Regions:
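A basic, Ser/Thr-enriched alpha-helical scaffold prevalent
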Residues: 1-240
């Protein structure tokens, strides 16, 4: 399993193989060819995470490998984009996206952290959830907003519980600016308020909880940068 952490597959103890970057490179190559089936198959096979049966998949050269790569939120968004290209931005597609995110969360995210608190989780972030809410707005999927926000409320609650537990460790930040991501996500919530899909009280409650989570993420990363020695990432040339 290749995660965003030190890996002993290299001779240099200060080097590591970034599994999420490798996964993203594979998926990006398929996405640029417009091969949505291969994009979804790459995510499902390489992360050991199931994709809803309603979407088209195919065999890929990686089908016989035993390697498991940790996904990033960018890879998750690539997979969801492939789903939307297959089905279209329709209200009926949103429940499938939500089911997919629940599977990812169980395998890698806050749900896994709940049952395996000692494992370092890969949390689904605000950028990914903002994409889903934006698609709800585009598809006029009023009835699907409540399940999406209920799922996000659970994500925030479980992540906050992990951050305040004895098992908490600095998490891998995937957004260059968590605060900017928080502002954009809140702007999307305010659009839901303007359409009267949610109340101002609900928007405020979600924002406050997300604010606490972002603070823990940023504070943990600052401590990690202050105490962690420098590690070399494999350059694109393949030499270290």
């Amino acid at each position: 399993m290749l995660r965003n952490a030190p890996c002993r597959l290299l001779p240099q103890p200060t080097s590591y193989i970034p599994g999420p970057r490798l996964l993203h490179a594979v998926m990006r190559a398929y996405a640029r060819r417009g091969d949505t089936a291969a994009t979804l198959s790459a995510f499902a096979r390489l992360t050991s995470t199931s994709v809803p049966d309603t979407f088209t998949t195919c065999e890929i050269p990686w089908h016989a490998t035993d390697v498991v790569l940790e996904p990033s939120n960018t890879s998750i968004i690539l997979a969801m984009d492939a789903m939307l290209q297959q089905r279209g931005v329709l209200a009926s597609t949103v429940p499938q996206l939500l089911h997919f995110l629940k599977q990812v969360d169980r395998s890698w995210g806050s749900w896994r952290a709940r049952h395996e608190p000692a494992a370092r989780p890969m949390f689904i972030n605000l950028r990914t959830m903002r994409h889903v809410l934006t698609w709800c707005l585009h598809a006029n999927a009023h009835d699907e907003v409540r399940p999406v926000l209920r799922f996000q409320q659970g994500l925030l609650r479980r992540e906050l519980r992990w951050h305040t537990s004895p098992h908490a460790r600095p998490v891998w930040l995937q957004d260059p600016n968590e605060w900017a991501s928080l502002r954009r996500w809140r702007h999307t919530l305010q659009q839901l308020v303007q359409r009267r899909w949610i109340s101002e009280r609900q928007e405020r409650a979600l924002y406050v909880k997300a604010l606490h989570v972002v603070r823990h993420r940023v504070m943990g990363t600052a401590r990690k940068m202050a105490h962690t020695s420098h590690r070399h990432i494999i350059p694109s040339s393949g030499t270290s």
